[in-house]
Amino acid sequence: MDRPDATFTLAYVVFALCFVFTPNEFRSAGFTVQHMFSEWLGSEDISFIQHHIRRTTLTVLFHSFLPLGYYIGMCFAAPEQNLMYVHHASQGWQMYFGLSLVIQLLSCALAFYWSRRGWANHPICKALSVHALPQSSWRAVASSINTEFRRIDKFASGSPSARVIVTDTWVMKVTTYSLHVALHQDCHLTVTDSKHHSLSPDLNTPVQIVTITVGSINPRVKSFDIRLKSTEYAELQEKLHAPIRNAANVVIHLTMSELFLETFKSYVRMNVVYKCPSGQELEPCIGCMQVNANVKLLCLCQSDEGECQQCYCRPMWCLTCMGKWFASRQDQQQPETWLSSRVPCPTCRAKFCILDVCPIE
């Protein structure tokens, strides 16, 4: 890794990946197309459609420049390769330069084609024209969307590279290279999948991501998927004019407590199993009286002395009720601390943490 060309290659690959997929650190530092060219792009709040037409065009141009940018950088990182003079470079580098140049020229030609006829050739404009009335154009649809986007009661969720926006009339998904649009009265939404993550990327809290497919009765409108947190599901329902179908029978956890309960159960199942002494019968859980007690509190964690305490109670609670008790004793304003906190036993008040909850065999 002492070679300058190897160091530059590694650094450029990391930079290119971050520039394309844009993590929060890059976005905060302003290394995004939207931030660097904000004056030319215009305000998203004022001209939403025009802003994203320009943004997607610039994004294609800059992302297609990355291969050529690597070649230019290597001209300085590896001067012994004679890359400054293409005809002196090796055949492999000549082919790479030619391919990079073709990619850049094609992207420029594509951007020029999109800009013709007042951007009418742009994919976003073509998608809007599908919803235009016979005597109208995509500009009328764009004007409607721009007006509704300026309202404060719109629903907006997700990262900038996959943002979901729902206004009074439109369901939209903003991606890196495109904008998907569907009309409320024409579309039908269906829950198709959900994924539960013990920790979200942004906060130290559990999160459930729900995938919803947006279809349309208009055959010219392509269906698309939107993803949002389960805690935002109820807000989305309020904004829509039609119910959301749950074709996959997905269980959606609408509150943080419900999400935490699933995470609590998954962690407890990884703990040490407690074997009941022979002859001991398990009684129904005193919390729900629906199932037998199936967890026992044992001080097994490696915490500092005086933190967790040994509980001498017999098994009296099921895993679900113990999880609900654990969640109910937390600071509701700081969910990121729930997994690492300690709560008193519901019966004897001995403090325990999540590592002390053992499933019963």
From Swiss-Prot:
InterPro entries: TM129 (IPR018801). Residues 1-6, 78-94 are lumenal. Residues 28-56, 116-361 are cytoplasmic. One of its GO terms (biological process) is protein ubiquitination. Integral component of ER-resident dislocation complexes. E3 ubiquitin-protein ligase involved in ER-associated protein degradation, preferentially associates with the E2 enzyme UBE2J2. This is E3 ubiquitin-protein ligase TM129. It comes from Danio rerio (Zebrafish). The gene is tmem129.
